[in-house]
């Protein structure tokens, strides 16, 4: 058990019987009241975000984790099959461990898998940016290229992303996997 004051952003704690990742932790001392820590956490079992106010003296259980590089191979029903690049062992990862970024996962992408001290999978971290090909989008007319609007486009993984008007079918684009937003066109 560790004091909440010694926990930082990115740490994984066991709270209410489930593993939670600390997204943000802010120390507050309001007026005549006692100090507290306002935590924004992500439940790693359900994927839901949770807000909680810890007292400044509260103790939490920090989970010892291990990160390993894996390569995404294919999807098997609800699970994603990943391969350890050193031992070539394959494991099935549930979609909830990857989260909404799973829609940008394409074959052979390297990911970091975070394991708990008991060997269970806590979360899967995709690269911050991925480069995907646009497979379907409406054609741009001459008038559209002069405006700064966006249009929907389907990328090779099947995900829909809003892109600028000048992007055409066949273009390679860079996408931020954290927000799902278009970043730039890749010139190859």
Swiss-Prot record:
Protein's UniProt name: Elongation factor P
Annotated family: Belongs to the elongation factor P family.
InterPro entries (alphabetical): Elong-fact-P_C, NA-bd_OB-fold, Rib_uL2_dom2, Transl_elong_fac_P/YeiP, Transl_elong_KOW-like, Transl_elong_P/YeiP_cen, Transl_elong_P/YeiP_CS, Transl_elongation_fac_P
BP terms from Gene Ontology: peptide biosynthetic process
PANTHER family hit by this protein: ELONGATION FACTOR P, ELONGATION FACTOR P (EF-P) FAMILY PROTEIN
Keywords, alphabetical: Cytoplasm, Elongation factor, Protein biosynthesis
Protein role: Involved in peptide bond synthesis. Stimulates efficient translation and peptide-bond synthesis on native or reconstituted 70S ribosomes in vitro. Probably functions indirectly by altering the affinity of the ribosome for aminoacyl-tRNA, thus increasing their reactivity as acceptors for peptidyl transferase.
Main location (coarse class): cytoplasm
Lineage: Bacteria, Pseudomonadati, Chlorobiota, Chlorobiia, Chlorobiales
Highest taxon, organism lineage: Bacteria
Gene for this chain: efp
Pfam hit, one: EFP
Gene3D superfamilies: 2.30.30.30, Nucleic acid-binding proteins
Location in the cell: Cytoplasm
GO MF: translation elongation factor activity
GO annotations of cellular component type: cytoplasm
Known pathway: Protein biosynthesis; polypeptide chain elongation
């Amino acid at each position: 058990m560790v004091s909440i004051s010694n926990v930082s952003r990115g740490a994984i704690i066991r709270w209410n019987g489930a593993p939670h990742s600390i997204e943000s932790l802010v120390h507050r001392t309001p007026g005549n009241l006692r100090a507290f820590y306002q935590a924004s956490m992500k439940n790693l079992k359900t994927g839901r975000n949770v807000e909680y106010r810890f007292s400044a003296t509260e103790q939490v259980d920090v989970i010892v984790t291990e990160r390993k590089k894996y390569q995404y191979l294919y999807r098997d029903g609800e699970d994603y099959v990943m391969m350890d690049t050193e031992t070539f062992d394959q494991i099935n990862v549930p979609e909830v461990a990857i989260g909404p970024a799973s829609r940008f996962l394409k074959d052979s992408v390297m990911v970091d898998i975070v394991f708990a001290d008991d060997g269970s999978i806590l979360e899967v971290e995709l690269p911050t940016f991925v480069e995907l090909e646009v497979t379907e989008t409406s054609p741009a007319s001459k008038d559209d290229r002069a405006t700064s609007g966006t249009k929907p486009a389907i990328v090779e993984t099947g995900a829909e992303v809003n892109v600028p008007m000048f992007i055409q079918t066949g273009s390679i684009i860079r996408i931020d996997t954290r927000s799902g937003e278009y970043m730039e066109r890749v010139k190859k």
